[in-house]
Regions:
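Terminal catalytic/cofactor-binding subdomain
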Residues: 1-68, 77, 98-118, 124-131, ...
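Histidine-centered divalent-metal-coordination microenvironment in nucleic-acid enzymes
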Residues: 71-88
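Inter-helical turn/loop segments and adjacent helix faces that build the functional surface
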Residues: 90-96
């Protein structure tokens, strides 16, 4: 890839963002008010990424680019499917964490993408049994501002992208890639 291709960051006509996040493509849905809109934009992102891979393969003259919707490279690296919510600042952060942490941990039982094997940043990939979540091996703490090391279930970076006096950003980085809309 050229320097320009590695640093590309596009805002798409549907309001989504498509960019290179370190070594892999990342698609961020536009802001959505309804669950059905999130699902539609998630599926649109799959199609956009697939078309980009097809174009790249055509330009390279063969099937050099492979596309996977996952949360791990099976070499000890993980990337999350993030949720971001605009939340009223009048709700105490301690109330959010007390109510959300048990739900977020148990959500992986229902919505986890699953994988075979165990891995971590230090240990790499070890073949093994089936797990319900691809991301769980990499979560290390309940709350933290970090996203690359000491990964939290609930990220505390407060970037609301709105009126800071009224709102906070609830940034969840525990999620697995969505495989099913149900």
């Amino acid at each position: 890839f050229s320097f320009h291709e590695m640093k590309s960051d596009l805002v798409l006509p549907n309001g989504a963002r498509f960019y290179n996040d370190h070594t892999h493509p990342e698609y961020s849905t536009p802001e959505c008010r309804r669950l059905l809109d999130v699902l539609a934009h998630d599926r649109a992102g799959e199609r956009i990424a697939q078309r980009a891979a097809e174009r790249r393969n055509h330009a390279l003259g063969g099937p050099h680019v492979q596309l996977y919707k996952n949360n791990t490279d099976f070499h000890g690296h993980s990337y999350g499917c993030h949720d971001n919510y605009l939340v009223s600042r009048s709700i105490p952060f301690s109330s959010l964490t007390a109510g959300l942490l048990p739900f977020l941990v148990s959500r992986q039982i229902i919505a986890g993408a699953g994988k075979v094997g165990v891995e971590g940043q230090e240990s790499g990939f070890v073949p093994g049994q089936y797990q319900l979540s691809q991301r769980a091996d990499f979560m290390e703490t309940d709350l933290s501002v970090d996203t690359m090391h000491n990964r939290p279930i609930l990220n505390t970076r407060d970037e609301p992208h709105a009126d800071r006096e009224k709102y906070r950003r609830l940034h969840l980085i525990i999620g697995d890639a969505n495989m099913c809309e149900y």
